[in-house]
Structure formats: structure tokens, C-alpha cells
């Protein structure tokens, strides 16, 4: 496999930091775009000399586009998670999710990036029959009138 230049949005988050470490172990180059509002720089201290870190908000189109120059693949993890935030800050949740994803899509088009990986959540399975749960488990649509689930 050819070494690639990856952009990981949300790369200082729990999952993002782990993915960045794995990509480096596989010989890839890693750029992280994160504003650290929920992530922690401490998660990437051991790899900070091997990565390029760009502090920025996923809603800032100029910052997103700057981070996507010379990138081969994007792993988009920059979302706000946690049930309490869906109730406390629903406008912010929606703003980050929608504007962030639109900026990523636009950047992929502008820079002709053909690989884009998006993350989801175990919430799409509600209460699964099998744990651990894999992608063969049927998705369950929750009550769409609950603000937490009404964004789709």
C-alpha cells in the first residue's frame, strides 16, 4: 500500500488519537485539524513530532481548506458527542455537524480528494441484540420527535 497523506478531523479525540497512531504505524503521514473543545492534546503528545497539527474549527472553511492541501484521504471525526450536549446545545451540535461536513465535502471536491471516511455512533443500533455490535446488526430508527434524534 502506498503511503498516503491523511487529514484526521477531531484527531485529539479518543477515537481520533487512536486512529492517528495507527496511521503512523502503517507508515502514513498525518495532519490533524482540531479545536480541542472536546479532545485533549495529551492524547497525541507521544506522536506530536510525527504529525502536523492545525488548531482550528471545522466550521471555518478557510482553515478546513488550508488543512486539506496535499491530502490524499480524509477521516472526518470532528463532531460534538455526548447525550447532554444534544439537550444543552442543540444549535451548536447541528452547526458543527452540518457546516463541518459541508466544508469537508467542498474541500474534497476542490482538492480532488477521493477518499473520505465518516464516523457514526452506536446510537444507530439503539439496544442491540449482540454486544459487541458489528455492522450486520439492523439499524433502528428512534423517536424522531425527540430533539436528540430529529436532526436527520
Regions found by a protein language model. Name each.
Residues 1-152:
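N-terminal Rossmann-like NAD(P)+-binding domain of SDR-like oxidoreductases, especially those catalyzing
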Amino acid at each position: 500500500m502506498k503511503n498516503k497523506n491523511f487529514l484526521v478531523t477531531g484527531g485529539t479525540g479518543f477515537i481520533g488519537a487512536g486512529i492517528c497512531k495507527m496511521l503512523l504505524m502503517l507508515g502514513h503521514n498525518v495532519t490533524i485539524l482540531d479545536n480541542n473543545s472536546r479532545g485533549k492534546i495529551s492524547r497525541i503528545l507521544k506522536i506530536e513530532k510525527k504529525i502536523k497539527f492545525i488548531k482550528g474549527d471545522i466550521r471555518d472553511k478557510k482553515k478546513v481548506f488550508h488543512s486539506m492541501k496535499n491530502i490524499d484521504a480524509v477521516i472526518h471525526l470532528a463532531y460534538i458527542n455526548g447525550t447532554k450536549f444534544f439537550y444543552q446545545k442543540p444549535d451548536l451540535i447541528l452547526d458543527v455537524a452540518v457546516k463541518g461536513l459541508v466544508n469537508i465535502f467542498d474541500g474534497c471536491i476542490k482538492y480532488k480528494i477521493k477518499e473520505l471516511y465518516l464516523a457514526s455512533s452506536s446510537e444507530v443500533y439503539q439496544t442491540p441484540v449482540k454486544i459487541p455490535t458489528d455492522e450486520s446488526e439492523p439499524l433502528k430508527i428512534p423517536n424522531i420527535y425527540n430533539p436528540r434524534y430529529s436532526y436527520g
